[in-house]
């Protein structure tokens, strides 16, 4: 039940911030990175290396961007779980 509640709030957060292209892109890239690591863990299949394997610098840059997006998404969780009356999370 808690997991469904978290999924519901996360989806609402994506819908409510869809007008902010940067935030939506950050969450999308974080999700792609999570799916890629899930594929690596389950099937030892790295989609990023498959797509950009012949260009190692692009793979490195992609992972750095995904890392920054993940950190931002983690910090952005405060806005998801704050009380409705609170507007600024410090």
Swiss-Prot record:
Q: Transmembrane segments in this chain: where?
A: 23-43, 48-68
Major location category of this protein: membrane
Q: How does it sit in the membrane?
A: Multi-pass membrane protein
Location comes to: Cell membrane
Task: List, alphabetically, the GO terms of the cellular component aspect.
Answer: plasma membrane
Q: Which UniProt keywords apply?
A: Cell membrane, Membrane, Transmembrane, Transmembrane helix
Q: Which InterPro entries match?
A: DUF378 (IPR007211)
| Keyword presence, Cytoplasm | no
Q: Please state what the protein is called.
A: Uncharacterized protein RP169
**UniProt source species:** Rickettsia prowazekii (strain Madrid E)
């Amino acid at each position: 039940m808690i997991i469904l509640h978290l999924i519901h709030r996360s989806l609402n957060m994506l819908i409510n911030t869809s007008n902010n292209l940067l935030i939506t892109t950050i969450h999308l890239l974080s999700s792609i990175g999570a799916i890629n690591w899930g594929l690596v863990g389950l099937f030892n299949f790295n989609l990023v290396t498959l797509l950009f394997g012949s260009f190692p610098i692009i793979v490195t840059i992609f992972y750095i961007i995904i890392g920054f997006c993940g950190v931002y998404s983690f910090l952005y969780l405060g806005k998801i779980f704050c009380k409705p009356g609170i507007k600024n999370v410090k």
